Amino acid sequence: MELNERKLNILKAIVKDYIETAEAIGSRTISKRHDLGVSAATIRNEMADLEELGYLIQPHTSAGRVPSEKGYKLYVNSLMSKSELDDNDKILIEQCMNHNINHIKELIHETSKLLSQLTNYTTVAVTKSLINQSVIKHIQLVAMNDNNILLIVVTDKGDLKKANLTTNVYLDQSKLNLISDNLTRKLLGKSITDLDDNLIAFIKYEISEYSGLIDELLNALNSNMKEEDFSLSLNGATNIFSYPEFNDVLKAKSFLNMLEKKETIADIIKSKGIQKDNLNIIIGSDNDCELAQDCSIVTATYNVDRDLVGRISFIGPTRMDYARIYSIINYMSLLINRK
């Protein structure tokens, strides 16, 4: 039994209608709502074939059919087309992105918050630590008082990091300026993660007169200046309750328990799913996490100069409006490419 064009059109219609209504779809409904050029009886026969092929499921309480995970996957892979965003959505997205366009981490987190409101799904923003990916542009030491020095590091990404240092030797600002210039020359273009033992030994040798201060400075660079591997923000955690699939209290509780586990969420959205443009789509049981197997997770990845800087993920029922999310992400990519 083959998947001919008629079966594909019927499957597409069922998926779209079920996403919209959350109700099992019958042949008469398809016949009335979609101009497929065939009778309700023919549609009914084709639906029976689609069920036999594993693309549809018949719930016990209904004569209609709903898409299976296999049906959703075929829809996402081959049948889905972008939906048209309304002008209001476009304006809100553009305003949010314009406000944060010079700060990629803030852009990702703030846009994720807006997208949760626009889609009524849970969204997760994950950004990698940019300070660890950046390279050093300038180092400045500033005298605060007799024993305290402020370390300021500026990176090529425009990030500014500070740390307080303590020294047993008084150093006036002119000496600190000389040390700052020397350190900047030695570390210019180096990533903080590049500070291996050989480089540290070389710096201490070159500025041996102030070895005590250099020890503390390098320790600050290696610890205080480094950030967590990623930061994660979650929006719309309770949006899931608006979907009938999660009316079951235990299912809803399991979902909320999953959202409380930051590392679990970060791992889930990195899992491999269906690839469509810059989207990764994980449907139902393809989720490695058992608590997420009633959900679909759609993730968009963002890069700066080919380096991964963050992801925005949408979490919702498998009856997710994939086409709308696809359109939103494509519109965001269009705006980013214009900048």
From Swiss-Prot:
It comes from the Bacteria. The keyword Transcription regulation applies. GO terms for molecular function: DNA binding. GO terms for biological process: negative regulation of DNA-templated transcription. Keywords: Repressor, Stress response, Transcription, Transcription regulation. Transmembrane segments: none annotated. Belongs to the HrcA family. NCBIfam families: hrcA. PANTHER family: HEAT-INDUCIBLE TRANSCRIPTION REPRESSOR HRCA (PTHR34824:SF1). HAMAP family: HrcA (MF_00081). Negative regulator of class I heat shock genes (grpE-dnaK-dnaJ and groELS operons). Prevents heat-shock induction of these operons. This is Heat-inducible transcription repressor HrcA. It comes from Clostridioides difficile (strain 630) (Peptoclostridium difficile). The gene is hrcA.
